[in-house]
Amino acid sequence: MSFKDLRSFIDHLETNGELKRISHPVDPHLEMTEIADRVLRAKGPALLFENPVGNDMPVLANLFGTPKRVAMALGKEDPIALRDVGELLAFLKEPEPPSGFKDAIAKIPMFKQALNMPPKTVRNPPCQQVVKTGEEVDLTKLPIQHCWPGDVAPLVTWGLTITKGPRQKRQNLGIYRQQLLGKDKLIMRWLDHRGGALDFKDFKEKHPGERYPVVVALGADPVTILGAVTPVPDAMSEYAFAGLLRGERTEVCKALSCDLEVPATSEIILEGYIDPEEMAEEGPYGDHTGYYNETDSFPVFTVTHMTHRKDAIYHSTYTGRPPDEPAMLGVALNEVFVPILRKQYPEIIDFYLPPEGCSYRMAVISIRKQYPGHAKRVMMGAWSFLRQFMYTKFIVVVDEDVNCRDWNDVIWAITTRMDPKRDTVMIENTPIDYLDFASPVAGLGSKMGMDATNKWQGETDREWGTPIVMDEAVKQKVDAIWNDLGIDDAPTL
């Protein structure tokens, strides 16, 4: 099932008991965060605050607060089915020619999907039903959340930032937090390696001193939103990828102030520019680490046009110590990463980003080990293969007999199969998340790999231990007589 806009997804969630309307007045200043946090930790529904204090625009929160809802947004019923999305991405990243007639027939569905890639331009889009320009633009009238007591100002969190570089044909969609600075100004916090920042850098080099056009969409359809946080190939637009997932072309329209295309069914559109000379100090804000981050200087986004649907809905979230909404997104998108990694490294059995690790800072990988040093090769490959793992600080590699998603198994493997000196890899001066205050220098720190696999000849001179396993016939006999033993609640082994 696909959703043309955010509202149709809201209706679907409500029909399936996955959304709760809240009519009681709730303040966007701190109260919404506390309510959403409690509901998310209880694995509760998405929330539609219909009466935010001081505003008549409803606020949608906790939309992707469970992996199930992430899957539902992509037309799947179970997060494990998101591996289909990963298979598609793996194919797009490295398409292989058919090996024969049968293989060509088998690949037809993927080629059919590719026909849905180009976005479709529409006229009179819903996102431009109401148009405000000049003095009419007032961002303070939006119900922007002030998430934590120590936050410096309200923060736009789910803005889909649309940019285009002078060297690319495709547009880039990215999600970057934006601090409210004034009636028509936001601080665009994009890190240097992100698509929007790279587009801006290229533009400044080619057009020094000129204003850079930027558009931010709030409340786009769920597939387009998730396309912006998925490892789409660099040469492909997120609009094209959203069309592939949806099974029909993404509807876009031309922005009023520039040539950028925006999601036509979005709830709110902010259009404007970044002056390369205008910067501002951003933060501090509570973030996904569970701490307040340092302040730093980022470009200022000046909003010249604000358009929106009639009776628009403001889409928002908060970030904090896991679990939070980004952590739940990480759990769901974990299934997308597995086929992509397997395509490059077929020896990988499973891959896990534990949500406690702030979504991406730790990874556990199980492999079918084939030679001495294999675990170290996989570590290096994972760090290098996808941009999403550039900031992963810790990688643990285990054998296929270890469930990499079970901490009991992983800790057992670490403590019995590792020698700290021999099996630990330390790499200095690597890219690290700017928000990681534990690193000695902002944006630059070390990485640690742990080889918790069984060691082969050449990796150790000692006889390696043999795992204890009960005789299968004995286990079956005990199963047969268990009810006669009078022992209750026995685990099934």
Swiss-Prot record:
Catalytic activity entry: a 4-hydroxy-3-(all-trans-polyprenyl)benzoate + H(+) = a 2-(all-trans-polyprenyl)phenol + CO2
Cofactor requirements of the protein: prenylated FMN; Mn(2+)
Record GO terms (molecular function): 3-octaprenyl-4-hydroxybenzoate carboxy-lyase activity; metal ion binding
Keywords on record: Cell membrane, Decarboxylase, Flavoprotein, FMN, Lyase, Manganese, Membrane, Metal-binding, Ubiquinone biosynthesis
Residues annotated to bind prenylated FMN: I175, Y176, R177, R189, W190, L191, R194, G195
Primary location group: membrane
GO cellular component: cytosol; plasma membrane
Function summary: Catalyzes the decarboxylation of 3-octaprenyl-4-hydroxy benzoate to 2-octaprenylphenol, an intermediate step in ubiquinone biosynthesis.
Protein name: 3-octaprenyl-4-hydroxybenzoate carboxy-lyase
Protein species of origin: Shewanella halifaxensis (strain HAW-EB4)
